[in-house]
């Protein structure tokens, strides 16, 4: 079966003399939750940016449903990100000028989703993740753990085919971390490919397999 997402021989470097990733490959199938681990500075976050079409590799390919999407025009890559991918960044990456609710809705509205329907779904996810009462607050008024759960709600709002999560439980207590991991597994159960960058062995234990950088 063709994997949902694959990297084929990815090479990337910020410093020409020091490759961060060198001829690196992975496949993630529908329904899989894969942990990406390794020492700090090995390029785990960069790998997610490459797989999420936010960076272009120096060499190699990113494949979505078996199709090479590495060299698509920027506008096409942006549409794929909005329609097929969900991202949870390590620092949550919330817009401080918008309310929490508008941050959750941002990608859905970019896709052209109906606002009322998206708002109802956002409210359900925010309640599930324990941040419903913060809907009209600004990101600067919520804790780091709450911001991470808000970012997860944004990532899952569109039922993405691929979820890329960078330390999604890093700021969370064990109970909240379980809620987040359960949500990622439910998305995988719907057929998504899920990659989770983590240093937490408890998170690795909940994943289907581990890939070490």
Where are these regions (language model features)?
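Conserved ABC ATPase signature
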Residues: 138-142, 146-148
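Helix-to-loop junction immediately C-terminal to a conserved catalytic motif
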Residues: 52
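Conserved ABC transporter NBD signature motif
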Residues: 60-68
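Short coil-to-helix segment of the ABC ATPase nucleotide-binding domain corresponding to the Q-loop/switch region
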Residues: 97-106
């Amino acid at each position: 079966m063709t994997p949902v997402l694959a990297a084929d021989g990815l090479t990337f470097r910020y410093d020409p003399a020091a490759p961060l990733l060198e001829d690196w490959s992975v496949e993630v199938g529908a329904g899989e939750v894969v942990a990406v681990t390794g020492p700090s500075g090995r390029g785990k976050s960069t790998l997610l940016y490459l797989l999420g079409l936010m960076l272009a590799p120096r060499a190699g390919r990113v494949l979505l449903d078996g199709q090479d999407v590495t060299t698509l025009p920027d506008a096409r890559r942006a549409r794929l990100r909005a329609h097929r991918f969900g991202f949870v960044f390590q620092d949550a990456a919330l817009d401080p000028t918008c309310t929490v609710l508008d941050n959750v809705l941002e990608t859905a509205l970019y896709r052209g989703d109906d606002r009322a329907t998206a708002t109802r779904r956002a409210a359900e996810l925010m309640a599930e993740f324990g941040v419903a009462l913060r809907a009209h607050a600004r990101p600067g008024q919520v804790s780091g753990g709450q911001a991470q759960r808000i970012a997860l709600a944004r990532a899952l709002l569109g039922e993405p085919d691929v979820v890329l999560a960078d330390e999604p439980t890093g700021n969370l207590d064990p109970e909240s971390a379980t809620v987040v991991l359960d949500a990622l597994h439910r998305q995988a159960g719907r057929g998504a490919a899920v990659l989770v960058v983590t240093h937490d062995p408890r998170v690795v234990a909940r994943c289907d397999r581990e890939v070490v950088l």
